[in-house]
Amino acid sequence: QGKIAGVQVINSGKAGADPEIRVRGTNSINGYKPLYVVDGLFNDNINFLNPQDIESMEILKDPSSLAIFGVRGANGVIIITTKKAKEGQTRVNINGSFGFKRVTDKIAMVDAAGFKELYNEQLRNEGNPEFDFTPWTGNTDWQDEIFQTGFITNNNVSITGASARHSFYLGAGYAYEQGNIKHEKYSKVTLNISNDYKVTDNFKVGFQFNGARILPADTKSVATALRAAPVAPVYNAEYGLYTTLPGFQKAQMNNPMVDVDLKANTTRAENYRASGNVYGQWDFLKNFQFKVMYSMDYASNSSRTYTPVINVFDSSVEGNVVTLGNGKTGVKQSKETEAKVQSDYLLTYTNTWGDHSLTATAGFTTYYNKLEMLGGERTQGVGLVIPDNPDKWYISIGDAATATNESKQWERSTVSMLGRVLYNYKGRYLFNGSFRRDGSSAFSYTGNQWQNFYSVGAGWLMSEEEFMKDITWLDMLKLKGSWGTLGNQNLDKAYPAEPLLTNAYSAVFGKPSAIYPGYQLSYLPNPRLRWEKVEAWEAGAEANFFRNRLHFEGVYYKKTTKDLLAEVPGISGTVPGIGNLGSIENKGVELAIDWRDRIGDWGYSAGFNLTTIKNKVLSLVQEGYSIIAGDKSQSYTMAGYPIGYFYGYKVE
């Protein structure tokens, strides 16, 4: 975070939550996550990895590097290589750490007196009588009530060993984290195994495995604590109950501590993840290398949530005790599985002759992704309270007459052919080009399943020219530029081939009149649907000064997303469908300066980077169309403005 120009990393503070990473802005309304490539396997998250098992991480931003990833490369690529054994004796490494975290910069809120004054001013402006705050004597900072100081610990052990022909790595880790909100806790156990064996001098095989068991945190929202009136006391000691909120709020929200405390530990969730690959690599005819790799990733997530009966103190009702909700216990249960299977076949040619150097790669890859989810919910039967016991939190114990269910499933496949060439002349003039052709089942019914992606790039190492040799303080100067096209098929829903008929309404027809069921299409099919395309280019320079101690890099970039996937407004009583109806532009400047030096046996470094990102929606569906998000409709996306800009009154 903060070390690489053009990369934004946002941590929510929730225990175990994945950081939000954006590379050079937001390219689409349908997802911003970069592609992770872990030891060759494509992935959309890396929560199964132990940070201690990561050997290196590289972030690709420029078009010439991303185009080779085709339909998956539009949002940037993060390449992660996990640790492997290095030749030498067997080594055992054990490390552990612990720490604490807390919210140090809370949002400033008015106290009870200030709230009463502002709320009554609002009522007067609306022509309404003032609210009687007489029974509301509290002065509560709800943020203080819900926040805690969280404890964090990470513990790892690894064993490595290698010989001239064989190497292995075994790593295991345990992480535990408490969240910023009371009762939040998260734990993860990880396992990493790799084994490589050199069968002959020119043929080797190996495998990689990563596994994880995660107990995710039952996270609660901070929003209620920011909206709850400070005039309400937290707790009524006489009744031993949390208090309700004033009448103007209690219909919309509960006392924040009801969710944080009384609903704590009411969810039992377990996530399992297994990811790995096997490969074979053959070097032949001096300059050729052929590599085959088969990879698989499987995730299984299950959860059970219990709904307890909750009573709160309310002085405005007879008896002063109110039961929230329907007064019934309930259980919700779900199971989700996702499988990813990938195969890669790569042929590489490398040669150097005279002043020329060439590396060429050709390949064929396949990728398959399938997700299935099934969930259900039941409440208690008459007089049959579901016990507050995790062993009983299964929907089979509830009343079948109250059962509801949900499901989600989809599968997609991608087939790709690719090629890339890297060439340099005299180590001064650098050229590269790539081509990738992707075919996706997501668009197979439209006839637009195939898409080509290209890139070209060039660099000039000016410092290697004769006319630069006399500049002693300049060690390296390089000018560079690239252009490429990228793709994006990401959408938070499947691409169904045929719409279903749903029995949504009834109609009266005939004489004598009779009621007949009415049907409508579940969505508007679009036979011309195609995936989003991103055209990007950049130009910049790199330089090293003062015996390579000072490094500078500056880049200007521009990316334009076309054929943006968006929902088409419903017409003639139909549900909205999906269409290519928008475009987005991102452009900006990246500057980075780093200084590295040594003083005796001590090394030190200092760095600074600056990134500007200007995001703008160029067009979206039709004039005046907007996408509204947020519980108070405070986030808008519409043409002429950035994605998700804040919408509201301007005040001084």
Task: Identify the role of each PLM range.
Residues 3, 39-67:
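Short acidic/polar hinge/loop motifs at secondary-structure boundaries
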